[in-house]
C-alpha cells in the first residue's frame, strides 16, 4: 500500500486505494465495475480465504463457481428469468392500439389493473412519488372507458381514443412493478418480457423535454432496477441525466413565474426521484455520478423554499379558466402550495401549520432519501474518484461521519425503530407491503459500511483496520437482523440495494471470523441467518443465488477452521501447520535484542508468557518455536495478498485460533505439557552454529 503524506493537510496513515474491475469479453466487449460496488473488498476477502484453505481455494478458483463480479451484477438476469415470448401471439382481450409496440405488452383486465394500480401507490409511490396520482388515474380510466368490451372482433380490442407511447410505458411499468408484490397474477401478455423491449423505445423520449416523457423514462428505469437489470437501468439513468438538463429540472422551478404551483411540485418530485436513482446506480455499479451537486439548485421538498417567482406569485392555471394537466390535486394541497408561494413573495402568509405538516409528511420518505443520497454522493467522491486525483484526508472523513450521524439523529423516532410485533397485521397487509423504518435503518447501515469498508483492505495490524472492522461488524449484524425481521413479518424486500448490503454484511462477518476478530459461534449463527435471507431473495433475483453460493463456501471454511482448532494439539499432524501465525499486537518489549553481542535475554514468563516480538518495523515475531517441536506455517500477511491472484499460487492453511485479542498467539499449546519448562533461549540457541549462513533464515 502506498502512503500519502502532506505537510499542510492531515492524511490517513495508510492510503486507502480501492480499485475497480474491468473484464474483457468476446467481440471487443468490456465491462467495468467500480470500487464503490465492493468488488475490491470482495476480492480481498476471497484471497484471504484462498490463502488459508486449500480445499476452498480449488472451489473458488473453479470456473463454474460464481466470480465476485457475478455476485454484484448478473449479466442478462432479466432475460434468463423470462422466456422470449412475442406478446402479439398471446391471448388477450385488449391492446393499446396501433403504433404501440407489442413488446411493451397489453393492458390487463380492468379488475386486475385496478388492483395493481392501488398496490403500486401503496408501495413504490411512497418512496418515489414521481407521478401525479390523479393524472395517471385519469389516464387509466380514459384507456379502459374507451375499450369496447362488447366488440366481437377477433383481434384484441383497441381503445377508441388513441393513447401515447409515454403513457403506455408508464402504465405498463406500474402494472409490472406492482405485480412483483401483489397476489394478482399479471397475465403473460401484459408483462414486459425483456429490458430490450423497453430500451429501444426510450431514446426518442429523452429528447422531447416534456414531463410525461421523462416520467416514462424514470418508470422504465425503476422497473429495470426492480428486476436487477442494473446495466440496462444505468443506460436509462444516462438518458435521464441528459433529459433533466434539457428540460431544466436541475433548476428550482419556483424561480420561474410561468410555472404553476402544481407544476413546481411535480417537477421537484420528479427531479429528486431521479437524483436518488442516479446515486443508487452509481454506488451499485461503481460508476461516476451522473448529476453533480454543484449543478443543482432545486430546493428540498420539505423546505425551506429559497427562491421567488421573478415577477408575480404563480396562480394555478385552473383559476384562470385554462385546463391544467395537474389540476387534479386536492384543494387543500393546492391552497397550501399557493399560500407558501405567496408568502415567499411577501404577499401573504401560510394559513395553517397543519397544511404545511401534511405536505411535509406526504414527501418525508423521499426527502430523507434525498439527504442520504447527498451523503452517499459525498462518500463516492471521497473514496472512489479516479486514483490520480483521489485525496482522502482525515478531516473530510470526520466531516462526512459527523453529517451521517447528524442525519440519523434527526430522523423521526418512527424511522429509527423497527418492531414488527407492534404493527397491526391486518392493517399492514391492507395498506403496506414495505416498511419505512426498516428501509431507513438499512440505508444508514449501508452508508456506514461504505465509508469504513475501504479500511478493511489495509493491513490488519493497523489501527485503522482494527477500528473499521469492529464498526463494520456492528453494522453487519444490524443489517442481517433487520432483513430477517422483515421476512418473518411478511414485508417485501423490494429495493435491490437490500441484496447487496445483506450479502456484504455476510462477507464482513465471514472475514472477521477468518481473522479471529469475531466469535466464530456467533458469526456462524448470523451468517446462517444471512444465508436464509439470500435464499429468500433468490426467489426474485438470480443474483442472490450467486451470493448464496459464495457465502455458503465461506461459512463451510469457517466451520472447518473451527473443527481443526478444537482438536487436541497432539492430534494435529505436521502437515496441518507450517508456521505460527504472527501476532500483530504483541508486546515488543518481551525480548530485547542486543545487536553488539547478539545476546538474548531470558523470556519473562510472568509478564508475558506467550508473546515476544522485536519492534523493528516488520511486526514479525522473533521467538518462533523450533520446528522439531511443532511444525506450523506462517500465514502471509493480508497486505501481501493484495497482489493479483494467481491460480497457481500455493494455498496456505491458517488454523490458529485467537481468543479475544487478535495479537495473541493461539492457545493450541494449552492442552499439552510445557515442553520448554526450565529451558532458556540461550540453551536452545547455544547448539546452533551462528556461523552457518542458513542459521538466521532457518529460525527467523
Curated annotation (Swiss-Prot):
InterPro entries: AtrR-like, Transcription_factor_dom_fun. Keywords: DNA-binding, Metal-binding, Nucleus, Transcription, Transcription regulation. Fusaproliferin shows cytotoxicity against pancreatic cancer cell lines and provides a new chemical scaffold that can be further developed to obtain more potent synthetic agents against pancreatic cancer. Fusaproliferin and its analogs show also anti-inflammatory activity and can be hit compounds for the treatment of inflammation-associated diseases. GO terms for biological process: DNA-templated transcription. The keyword 4Fe-4S does not apply. SMART domains: Fungal_trans. Pfam families: Fungal_trans. The keyword S-adenosyl-L-methionine does not apply. Residues 577-595, 608-623 have a biased composition (Polar residues). It is found in: Nucleus. GO terms for cellular component: nucleus. Residues 343-364, 577-624 are annotated as: Disordered. Residues 596-607 have a biased composition (Basic and acidic residues). GO terms for molecular function: DNA binding; DNA-binding transcription factor activity; zinc ion binding. Probable transcrition factor; part of the gene cluster that mediates the biosynthesis of the mycotoxin fusaproliferin (FUP) that belongs to the class of bicyclic sesterterpenoids. This is Probable transcription factor FUP6. It comes from Fusarium proliferatum (strain ET1) (Orchid endophyte fungus).
Amino acid at each position: 500500500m502506498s502512503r500519502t503524506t502532506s505537510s499542510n493537510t492531515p492524511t490517513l496513515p495508510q492510503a486507502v486505494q480501492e480499485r475497480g474491475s474491468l473484464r474483457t469479453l468476446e467481440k471487443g466487449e468490456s465491462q467495468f465495475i467500480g470500487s464503490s460496488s465492493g468488488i475490491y473488498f470482495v476480492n480481498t476477502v476471497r484471497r484471504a480465504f484462498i490463502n488459508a484453505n486449500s480445499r476452498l481455494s480449488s472451489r473458488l478458483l473453479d470456473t463454474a463457481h460464481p466470480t465476485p463480479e457475478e455476485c454484484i451484477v448478473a449479466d442478462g438476469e432479466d432475460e434468463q428469468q423470462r422466456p422470449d415470448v412475442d406478446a402479439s401471439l398471446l391471448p388477450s382481450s385488449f391492446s393499446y392500439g396501433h403504433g404501440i409496440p407489442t413488446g411493451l405488452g397489453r393492458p390487463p383486465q380492468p379488475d386486475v389493473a385496478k388492483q395493481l394500480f392501488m398496490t403500486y401507490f401503496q408501495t413504490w409511490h411512497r418512496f418515489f412519488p414521481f407521478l401525479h396520482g390523479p393524472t395517471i388515474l385519469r389516464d387509466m380510466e380514459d384507456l379502459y372507458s374507451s375499450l369496447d368490451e362488447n366488440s366481437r372482433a377477433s383481434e384484441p380490442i383497441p381503445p377508441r381514443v388513441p393513447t401515447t407511447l409515454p403513457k403506455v410505458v408508464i402504465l405498463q411499468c406500474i402494472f409490472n412493478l406492482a405485480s412483483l408484490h401483489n397476489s394478482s397474477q399479471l397475465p403473460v401478455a401484459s408483462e414486459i418480457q425483456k429490458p430490450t423491449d423497453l430500451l429501444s423505445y426510450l431514446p426518442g423520449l429523452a429528447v422531447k423535454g416534456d414531463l410525461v416523457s421523462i416520467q416514462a423514462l424514470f418508470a422504465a428505469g425503476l422497473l429495470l432496477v426492480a428486476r436487477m437489470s442494473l446495466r440496462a437501468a444505468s443506460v436509462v439513468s444516462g438518458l435521464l441525466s441528459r433529459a433533466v438538463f434539457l428540460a431544466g429540472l436541475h433548476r428550482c422551478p419556483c424561480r420561474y413565474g410561468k410555472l404553476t404551483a402544481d407544476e413546481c411540485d411535480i417537477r421537484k418530485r420528479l427531479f429528486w426521484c431521479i437524483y436518488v436513482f442516479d446515486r443508487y446506480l452509481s454506488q451499485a455499479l461503481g460508476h461516476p455520478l451522473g448529476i453533480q451537486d454543484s449543478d443543482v439548485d432545486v430546493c428540498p421538498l420539505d423546505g425551506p423554499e429559497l427562491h421567488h417567482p421573478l415577477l408575480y406569485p404563480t396562480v394555478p392555471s385552473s383559476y384562470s379558466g385554462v385546463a391544467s394537466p395537474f389540476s387534479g390535486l386536492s384543494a387543500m394541497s393546492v391552497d397550501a402550495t399557493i399560500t407558501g408561494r405567496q408568502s415567499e413573495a411577501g404577499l401573504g402568509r401560510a394559513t395553517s401549520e397543519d397544511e404545511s405538516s401534511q405536505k411535509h409528511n406526504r414527501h418525508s420518505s423521499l426527502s430523507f432519501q434525498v439527504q442520504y443520497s447527498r451523503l452517499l454522493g459525498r462518500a463516492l467522491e471521497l473514496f472512489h474518484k479516479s486514483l490520480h486525483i483521489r485525496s482522502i484526508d482525515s478531516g473530510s472523513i470526520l466531516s462526512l461521519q459527523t453529517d451521517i450521524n447528524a442525519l440519523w439523529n434527526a430522523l423521526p423516532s418512527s424511522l429509527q425503530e423497527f418492531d414488527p410485533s407492534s404493527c397491526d397485521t391486518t392493517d399492514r397487509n391492507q395498506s403496506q407491503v414495505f416498511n419505512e423504518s426498516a428501509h431507513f435503518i438499512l440505508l444508514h447501515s449501508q452508508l456506514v459500511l461504505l465509508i469504513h469498508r475501504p479500511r478493511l483492505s489495509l493491513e490488519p495490524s493497523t489501527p485503522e483496520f482494527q477500528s473499521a472492522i469492529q464498526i463494520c461488524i456492528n453494522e453487519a449484524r444490524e443489517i442481517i437482523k433487520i432483513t430477517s425481521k422483515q421476512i418473518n413479518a411478511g414485508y417485501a424486500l423490494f429495493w435491490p440495494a437490500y441484496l447487496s448490503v445483506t450479502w456484504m454484511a455476510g462477507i464482513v462477518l465471514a472475514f472477521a471470523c477468518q481473522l479471529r476478530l469475531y466469535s466464530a459461534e456467533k458469526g456462524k449463527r448470523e451468517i446462517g441467518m444471512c444465508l436464509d435471507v439470500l435464499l429468500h431473495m433468490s426467489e426474485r433475483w438470480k443474483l442472490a443465488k450467486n451470493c448464496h453460493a459464495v457465502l455458503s463456501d465461506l461459512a463451510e471454511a469457517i466451520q472447518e477452521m473451527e473443527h481443526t482448532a478444537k482438536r487436541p494439539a497432539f492430534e494435529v499432524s505436521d502437515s496441518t501447520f507450517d508456521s505460527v501465525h504472527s501476532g500483530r499486537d504483541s508486546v515488543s518489549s518481551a525480548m530485547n535484542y542486543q545487536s553488539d553481542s547478539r545476546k538474548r535475554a531470558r523470556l519473562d514468563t510472568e509478564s508475558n508468557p506467550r508473546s515476544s516480538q522485536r519492534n523493528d518495523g516488520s511486526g514479525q515475531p522473533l521467538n518462533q518455536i523450533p520446528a522439531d517441536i511443532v511444525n506450523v506455517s506462517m500465514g502471509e500477511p493480508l497486505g501481501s495478498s493484495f497482489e493479483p491472484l494467481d491460480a497457481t499460487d500455493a494455498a496456505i492453511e491458517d488454523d490458529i485460533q485467537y481468543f479475544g485479542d487478535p495479537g495473541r498467539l493461539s492457545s493450541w499449546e494449552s492442552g499439552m505439557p510445557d515442553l520448554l519448562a526450565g529451558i532458556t533461549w540461550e540453551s536452545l540457541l547455544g547448539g546452533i552454529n551462528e556461523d552457518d549462513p542458513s542459521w538466521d533464515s532457518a529460525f527467523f
